[in-house]
Amino acid sequence: MASDIEIAQRATMERITKVAAEKLGIDDEHLEPYGHFKAKISLDYVDSLKDRPDGKLILVTAISPTPAGEGKTTTTVGLGDALNRIGKKASICLREPSLGPVFGMKGGAAGGGYAQVVPMEDINLHFTGDFSAIALATNLLAAMIDNHIHHGNELNIDVRRIAWKRVVDMNDRALRDITIALGGTANGFPRQDGFDIVVASEVMAIFCLANSIEDLKARLGAIVIGYTTDQKPVHARDLQANGAMAVLLKNALKPNLVQTLENNPAFIHGGPFANIAHGCNSVLATKTALKLSDYVVTEAGFGADLGAEKFIDIKCRKSGLRPQAVVIVATIRALKYHGGVELKELNTENLDALRKGLSNLERHINNIRNHYGLPVVVAINHFTADTAAEVDLLKKSVADLGAPIVVCRHWAEGGKGAEDLARVVVEMIDKVPSDFHFVYEDSASLWDKATAVATKLYGATKVTADAKVRNQIKKLEESGYGNFPICIAKTQYSFSTDAKLRGAPTGHDINIREVRLAAGAEFIVLVCGDVMTMPGLPKIPSATKIDLNEKGEVVGLF
């Protein structure tokens, strides 16, 4: 079978104006094309949709992944195409890929096989420039902080307690801890600093949670960049930075529209990581899709313990969105991985390891059903190495849990390979009522919120933290931030904070080692374990395989 990029480059794309008009009813005047196959949708048009009824929202999540990923994006695309094939008016909503993972381990993030979004190279490489705008807005604020200090520090900012970092959309471990403003007094006040990857930035989170330009500007102004020497918070609005930041973001905030290989609409907008941020595409894009479609399929990053938890406890809580069904993507290879099989042996049949690894899937199913009250269907993303015995064992085991299960072949067959999944999802939405609720209430203390997620979803015994972290949490509550939801930053490979603990571990502790206030995004980041907000490249980055051929075509994306 051809590679992902070969399939994408052979695709027959429709002009995006045609997709918008025929599939969504959007007139040309409301589109801002970026070439023939990408467009932004005007915010005036988005606002004009507010009184329309919403379609049905379907969340695609997954079991705890292997390092290779398990096909959430592929399944989201395949399910969206399948819904259209069975006569439903459906759109999909995805995050924009970050260049860090594209050039690092993933090599691309636009689906796979015959379940992709296109133009694939453009989507993976710069797209419409949204991430550049987000990085520029973040770095403008950083520059204004250091400039203010250099010119007398009227706000009395404590240079030891600046909480704002610069960002770049690249995996670059050398930038994690640096010293800036060296070289003499003309270059500013030297201090220790560092970079985050742009998808971990607060501006990215604000961008994805904002409902309008006005909301965006207010949230940017609420950012706490640090503290004064008498421990009072300093906001971006105190530096008069939020207006200029909003100017940089005003065009980026317009939702992006592209298409699948089967010429169905795809909204791709925003892209925070789910292990170190909240892991969902923009509220504006999701709400726009719901006004224009009967069914909207969206994904949340990594496993359900990270992406789905944050989709529900942060995005849904803040936006009023409510999913009607959840699809949990699982692969036989990942379940064997959770049963103890190493990566190089995952293509070999191993029923014992599969049985053992099923504990991971079972916990994710129970978490969604019991702690969020949502109906669940399991989608098995089929790989050619899966044996009949493994598929039969998995079907029986999931059936014993009382959840519907569908083997999907959208990677090889496109939407046709996910039609059975589409029918099951539609029937479940029609017949199985949801009892939607959150895993914690706004009124709970920050510590109790962390404890609820850790004990109910992760299988942990308790949450721990040293005295410094506990004191930070206490001060945040005293400052009026106790009603914010929490965003736990941890490894995606385990329910615990130890990536080596596979399956469904119990009896572990979740240790909070750092607390970050995201006052503009309106959540509190609790950093647990060894997770980094600036990743590094692997020993052999995907960048070594990405190139231009003699025709000027991109090769090596996958």
From Swiss-Prot:
SUPFAM superfamilies: P-loop containing nucleoside triphosphate hydrolases (SSF52540). This is Formate--tetrahydrofolate ligase. The keyword Lipid metabolism does not apply. Belongs to the formate--tetrahydrofolate ligase family. One of its GO terms (molecular function) is ATP binding. Keywords: ATP-binding, Ligase, Nucleotide-binding, One-carbon metabolism. It catalyses: (6S)-5,6,7,8-tetrahydrofolate + formate + ATP = (6R)-10-formyltetrahydrofolate + ADP + phosphate. Its EC number is 6.3.4.3. InterPro entries: Formate_THF_ligase, Formate_THF_ligase_CS, P-loop_NTPase. Pathway: One-carbon metabolism; tetrahydrofolate interconversion. The keyword RNA-binding does not apply. Signal peptide: none annotated. It comes from Methylocella silvestris (strain DSM 15510 / CIP 108128 / LMG 27833 / NCIMB 13906 / BL2). Pfam families: FTHFS. GO terms for biological process: tetrahydrofolate interconversion. ATP binds at T66, P67, A68, G69, E70, G71, K72, T73.
